[in-house]
Amino acid sequence: MRKIIHVDMDCFFAAVEMRDNPALRDIPIAIGGSRERRGVISTANYPARQFGVRSAMPTAMALKLCPHLTLLPGRFVAYKEASRHVRDIFSRYTSLIEPLSLDEAWLDVTDSPHCYGSATLIAREIRQTIFNELQLTASAGVAPVKFLAKIASDLNKPNGQYVITPADVPGFLKTLPLAKIPGVGKVSAAKLENMGLRTCGDIQQCDLAMLLKRFGKFGRVLWERSQGIDERDVNSERLRKSVGVERTLAEDIHEWSDCEAIIEHLYPELERRLAIVKPDLLIARQGVKLKFNDFQQTTQEHVWPQLNKEDLIITARKTWNERRGERGVRLVGLHVTLLDPQLERQLVLGL
């Protein structure tokens, strides 16, 4: 049985700001774009969260909920440096590390000799070391598989950890809401609930063939996760090939002005996600996705060397005019395809 740890830094960007400026510790702060630029919140500290401020929330809404919110533009150089230090701490315990972003990662410590081979003790020691060396807190989840470790890391935040042993898995899954499974969003959760499926225990009673018919490949993932099956390895060579952000709309839109407003809202989040993956990575292409109310979708992209909002809007307008017809639009997405590192090195080195 494998021993997987998921480590998640607590409100990471905000925590770095509070560490470097103690005057910010007890007041509501958030990292994000300005209200005037239709920005969104990237991270909020716990005092701000008490007012309802959350990640991915429009800045204008956050300021309505918390008028005295201190808004910071973000210092990605500082965040990357802290993230590198955390990664160095991980590497003292295992070489099997799979980063998901600057502030979270999976670790496979199955064969680690540290702490008598106890994943629970390793997680505790890693968290203490992070605090000792960086004055930042982290939460952790320990489980036999990746998705359960990720869920567990969120159950005792902040500055805590939660352990799911192999013996705990059946009981834990029986009452686990399907919405907690990574990849099950609000739309999918609502669709499942309309079918009377709310927990993994409900899925365990379902026929796999029915799930495949209703949900395709996603149906198999649901069934496997509900059984505690997740055979994915912790991949230390994982390479992000693209970065995207999209929104499924509560109501279909039929006017271009509505689509443009959504792009304006999504763009800062795309900037943030790209910066987290690797700010200096070259872009191969950028593009847009529209999904229509008949569930058909179209993607339009072209070669572009750097992220550019105006170009994305022009591309989306062209796609809207040429491919929508009379259909309503139920999803709008933006994405970039990252340049292969091998090719990037060749371009940088030249001849």
Swiss-Prot record:
What keywords is this UniProt entry annotated with? Answer: Cytoplasm, DNA damage, DNA repair, DNA replication, DNA-binding, DNA-directed DNA polymerase, Magnesium, Metal-binding, Mutator protein, Nucleotidyltransferase, Transferase
Q: Gene3D superfamilies under this entry?
A: 3.30.70.270, 3.40.1170.60, 5' to 3' exonuclease, C-terminal subdomain (1.10.150.20), DNA polymerase, Y-family, little finger domain (3.30.1490.100)
- Catalytic residues per the record? 104
Protein's recorded name: DNA polymerase IV
Tell me, what does this protein do in biology?
Poorly processive, error-prone DNA polymerase involved in untargeted mutagenesis. Copies undamaged DNA at stalled replication forks, which arise in vivo from mismatched or misaligned primer ends. These misaligned primers can be extended by PolIV. Exhibits no 3'-5' exonuclease (proofreading) activity. May be involved in translesional synthesis, in conjunction with the beta clamp from PolIII.
Q: Which Pfam families match?
A: IMS, IMS_C, IMS_HHH_1
Q: What is its main location?
A: cytoplasm
| Gene Ontology CC, one term | cytosol
Q: Provide the binding site for Mg(2+).
A: 8, 103
Q: Which organism is it from?
A: Salmonella choleraesuis (strain SC-B67)
